[in-house]
Amino acid sequence: MLKKDKSELTDIEYIVTQENGTEPPFMNEYWNHFAKGIYVDKISGKPLFTSEEKFHSECGWPSFSKALDDDEIIELVDKSFGMVRTEVRSEESNSHLGHVFNDGPKESGGLRYCINSAAIQFIPYEKLEELGYGDLISHFDK
């Protein structure tokens, strides 16, 4: 499993995950990335999302219709910037991931997890076994 020490984070990774920042839309690594695989927490390495639930939302950030395991996601009320939103954080590392909204694809449950690329790392399907995520291969065989 991939893990990263907080001292190894880039400036934007630190700002996003530790200071609740947001990276610019359309100028981040995974907003338009649709390869087969999983997305893990940048710090803990815990699997959070799969490419099977990723969709193109036109918001400029990676969007997913559901989390791989709801127990790995913490939801908190976020009243910053004069808005009321639902913040999502990773359970194990308590890193800020982004927000979840109720405007996702209805056929997939209606949720849109809007996630900062700086908070996650993509693991290609072909590398799942090698990197310790072999138990997730079955999610793609449905």
Swiss-Prot record:
One of its GO terms (biological process) is protein repair. InterPro entries: Met_Sox_Rdtase_MsrB, Met_Sox_Rdtase_MsrB_dom, Mss4-like_sf. It catalyses: L-methionyl-[protein] + [thioredoxin]-disulfide + H2O = L-methionyl-(R)-S-oxide-[protein] + [thioredoxin]-dithiol. Residues 2-125 form the MsrB domain. The keyword Hydrolase does not apply. The active site is at C114. GO terms for cellular component: cytoplasm. One of its GO terms (molecular function) is peptide-methionine (R)-S-oxide reductase activity. Belongs to the MsrB Met sulfoxide reductase family. This is Peptide methionine sulfoxide reductase MsrB. It comes from Staphylococcus aureus (strain JH9). The gene is msrB.
